[in-house]
Regions:
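Secretory/extracellular carbohydrate-interaction modules
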Residues: 64-133
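Carbohydrate-binding surfaces in secreted/extracellular proteins
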Residues: 88, 154-194
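Short, exposed beta-strand/loop patches in secreted or surface proteins that constitute
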Residues: 49-55, 121-126, 163
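Bacterial Sec-dependent N-terminal signal peptides
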Residues: 17-47, 51-53
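Short, aromatic/His-centered strand-loop micro-motif at the edge of beta-sheets
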Residues: 136-160
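Short carbohydrate-recognition loop motifs
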Residues: 50-70
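Sec-dependent bacterial lipoprotein signal peptides
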Residues: 1-20
């Protein structure tokens, strides 16, 4: 059976603003501002859409009224993994911790993220206040690459993240704080275990 690949997003807290843009890598790369993207509200979102506000002005915003939010997610279907770029901006209105962080699934074997899935994701925060790339097999996450600790301090900054997977299974990710003019290449790692 062919694994269904979904670009997905999982959020483990309240009030996350996400500006989302996904495209194939271009030779003449345009480093435009992800905030200018107006396609977010037009994407075919699935999952717990009642917990999110989705519009072209704010992008995707977690709006779960529960005090103890737990896990909330929305997904969009896709067949692309290799030779693909994911690019998005995030503003967390909380200071991430070991128990309070955000996950953005780039690929997943299921559009239901509350169980066993195979896929790759970016995690913001956690035991370290960094951005990291993980592979998940079933319920077991494996850290593939860890970036700089950009989420330290009391105020969580606005952060832009770019991830690419090439045809050979090399994953590369970059980060850029709102105060920075250019992306910083964090890591590159080869992993095509579940591609």
């Amino acid at each position: 059976n062919r694994m269904r690949i979904c670009k997905t997003f999982t959020f483990l807290s309240i009030f996350i603003v996400l500006f989302y843009n996904c495209s194939l890598p271009a030779d003449d790369e345009d480093e435009g501002n992800p905030e200018e993207d107006n396609t977010t509200s037009e994407l075919p979102w699935e999952g717990e859409t009642d917990k999110f506000t989705i519009n072209s002005k704010e992008g995707l915003r977690l709006n779960d009224p529960q005090e103890n939010a737990g896990t909330a997610y929305v997904t969009i279907p896709s067949n692309s993994v290799k030779n693909t770029r994911w690019e998005f901006g995030v503003r967390l209105t909380f200071n991430p911790s070991a128990n309070n962080y955000a996950r953005f699934y780039l690929t997943s074997s299921s559009n239901v993220l509350s169980g066993n899935v195979n896929g790759y994701y970016i995690q913001i925060g956690g035991a370290k206040d960094n951005v990291a790339l993980y592979r998940q097999n079933g319920e077991q996450p494996k850290l593939l690459a860890s970036g700089r600790e950009v989420m330290k301090g009391n105020n969580s900054p606005k952060l832009y993240i770019k991830v690419e997977c090439d045809n050979n299974g090399y994953w590369t990710f970059w980060t850029r704080l709102e105060s920075e003019n250019e992306y910083t290449k964090e890591k590159q790692v080869k992993d095509n275990s579940i591609l």
